[in-house]
Amino acid sequence: MKLPIYFDYSATCPVDPRVAEKMMQCLTMDGNFGNPASRSHRFGWQAEEAVDTAREQVADLMNADPREIVFTSGATESDNLAIKGAARFYSKKGKHIITCKTEHKAVLDPCRQLEREGFEVTYLDPEANGLIDMAKLRDAIREDTVLMSIMHVNNEIGVIQDITAIGELCRENKIVFHVDAAQSIGKLPIDVQAMKVDLISVTSHKIYGPKGIGALYVRRKPRIRLEAQMHGGGHERGMRSGTLATHQIVGMGEAFRIAKEEMEQDRVHTLALRTRLLDGLKDMESVHINGDLEQRVSSNLNISFAFVEGESLLMALKDLAVSSGSACTSASLEPSYVLRALGLDDELAHSSIRFSFGRFSTEEEIDYAITQIRTAVEKLRDMSPLWDMHKEGIDLNSVEWAHH
């Protein structure tokens, strides 16, 4: 077993060796290095053929038409293109958008930008388990609602929203429906025909493909129109200009092909690891699981260890690569906005750790992690006067702290 152990698969995954091998074939003079937009010679034709194959592989994982796949630089760009592109195109019909407070920043920040442009955004509160109440969602819809953006799986707590039901609601009300599926693609079955989703953002590096490449699914029937955010050579049917990165696209295609074949195998593997970790920790005192445990992707576990500062625990677990919050926000010392939206107080939100497992995680690593976590938590609690007070039965909420 090699240290440190990687338990941060929700932040990114290592590239699968099979994917890396395919990518290597598209880089050098001996390989398929041409520009897919070069129509006048064989190098361009071969590159275009490789891109077309990858486009089919990406479409295949979500039961889409390859012509509905637009390649981007990743899920952040896909989210921006979907949200700003759709909102601006349909702004004559209305300027109201609905989303949720626990969305990724790549959804929340484009919404904030649209607010500066005169749009109104409703940010829904999730329930305490992280799921959205359908009645509240229905009540938020107005005459001028043009767009709804709800993520499939949350990046911090791994809960799965009922995208099929939300899709039906949006279709009934003629609202464009965007889903950020960065954390669900390749982990859960996605069928765009059954789900009635109009726009889906996906990325490659969360399912063992390379970073820097993603895609946006844009429905053709009924056709969804977008205002381009990137202008240039008119690539990707005018929706996203820029030379296509053949090696990254081929890598993404191969990662999606493998995911389709091995999705169930990966799910069973990660679920067994999560259950093992949970079984090893659940008898500890004051341990709180964040988010619904049933409606949850198998590779994620987010736990708060009360009376332990999250940052100190991260430092104590120096041989485990885990995170507090998402990778995009774990550098800040603010408590997770996702956990705050679930109603956790600052202390509990601050003491949370996200474990995420993957294809290359092992039982041996889990067993090592259990020992390390139990030792670290016990040691840190021994140093905490609050833990002593809690053990003595003092209600910490009723204590009046002196201000100096």
From Swiss-Prot:
Give the principal location in a single coarse category. cytoplasm
The answer on whether this UniProt entry bears the keyword Cytoplasm reads: yes
Q: Which GO molecular function entries does the Swiss-Prot or TrEMBL record give?
A: 2 iron, 2 sulfur cluster binding; cysteine desulfurase activity; metal ion binding; pyridoxal phosphate binding
Q: Where in the cell is it found?
A: Cytoplasm
The entry's [2Fe-2S] cluster-binding residues are 328
Which InterPro entries does this UniProt record tie to the protein? Aminotrans_V_dom (IPR000192), Aminotrans_V_PyrdxlP_BS (IPR020578), Cys_deSase_IscS (IPR010240), Cysteine_dSase (IPR016454), PyrdxlP-dep_Trfase (IPR015424), PyrdxlP-dep_Trfase_major (IPR015421), PyrdxlP-dep_Trfase_small (IPR015422)
**Residue numbers annotated as active site:** 328 (cysteine persulfide intermediate)
Write down the PROSITE patterns for this protein, in alphabetical order.
Answer: AA_TRANSFER_CLASS_5 (PS00595)
**Positions annotated to bind pyridoxal 5'-phosphate:** 75-76, 155, 183, 203-205, 243
Provide GO CC annotations from the record: L-cysteine desulfurase complex
**Could you tell me what reaction this enzyme catalyses?**
(sulfur carrier)-H + L-cysteine = (sulfur carrier)-SH + L-alanine
The UniProt entry's GO biological process terms, in alphabetical order, are:
[2Fe-2S] cluster assembly
The record's listing under PANTHER family reads: CYSTEINE DESULFURASE, CYSTEINE DESULFURYLASE FAMILY MEMBER
Q: Which family does it belong to?
A: Belongs to the class-V pyridoxal-phosphate-dependent aminotransferase family. NifS/IscS subfamily.
Query: What is the protein's known function?
Result: Master enzyme that delivers sulfur to a number of partners involved in Fe-S cluster assembly, tRNA modification or cofactor biosynthesis. Catalyzes the removal of elemental sulfur atoms from cysteine to produce alanine. Functions as a sulfur delivery protein for Fe-S cluster synthesis onto IscU, an Fe-S scaffold assembly protein, as well as other S acceptor proteins.
* Self-association and partners: Homodimer. Forms a heterotetramer with IscU, interacts with other sulfur acceptors.
Instruction: State the protein's name.
Output: Cysteine desulfurase IscS
Species, as recorded: Photobacterium profundum (strain SS9)
